């Protein structure tokens, strides 16, 4: 999904401030995140590579805050209130689960004015619901709309999930931190949906 550079001075300072505010040292935060203290220190120094939206959400959750509170204030990237993304500017990312191409994310236009809004067109490449790979539930609510094909949706308890078959035109709302997974319906090949995280 969307990547945010940890080199941002704003993120580094906000992370350090929040960690200190909740009285955690590097080791305590690292332990809760499954990272090393050196990694946390690197993030606070504006180093450490890139973090995904999911990783930022996990850090925010552990620190009892929001992704927005850990990111610098938005600048204005709009032109008289509008931003346009042309087709050749659209990032395309592969979602891989257990070394299998699972999704292709076509990242739609984003703006600094609404940094938590992440709109995607998702090509769902697997059609075996038995192989559905649950996420752990992410920060931010999610809206889904099925554009093509049928989606087999699972959510909640991974061992005893709730399930629904969503035909073209169906939509669904998923509350933040609810584990979920979706595949194309069994034997249908693939499907396509719009997903908006906010």
UniProtKB/Swiss-Prot annotation:
E.C. number(s) listed in UniProt: 1.11.1.23
Molecular functions per Gene Ontology: dioxygenase activity; DNA binding; DNA-binding transcription factor activity; ferrous iron binding; oxidoreductase activity, acting on paired donors, with oxidation of a pair of donors resulting in the reduction of molecular oxygen to two molecules of water
Cupin type-2 domain residues: 136-196
Effect of residue 23 to A: Abolishes (S)-2-hydroxypropylphosphonic acid epoxidase activity
DNA-binding region per Swiss-Prot/TrEMBL record: 26-45
Protein's UniProt name: (S)-2-hydroxypropylphosphonic acid epoxidase
Organism lineage: Bacteria, Bacillati, Actinomycetota, Actinomycetes, Kitasatosporales
Biological source species: Streptomyces wedmorensis
Catalytic activity: (S)-2-hydroxypropylphosphonate + H2O2 = (1R,2S)-epoxypropylphosphonate + 2 H2O
Keyword Transport: no
Gene Ontology CC: cytosol
Residues at which Fe cation binds: 138, 142, 180
The keyword Calcium is assigned to this record: no
Function field: Non-heme-dependent dioxygenase that catalyzes the oxidative epoxidation of (S)-2-hydroxypropylphosphonate into (1R,2S)-epoxypropylphosphonate, the final step in the biosynthesis of fosfomycin antibiotic.
Cofactor(s) this protein cannot do without: Fe(2+)
GO biological process: antibiotic biosynthetic process; phosphinothricin biosynthetic process; protein homotetramerization
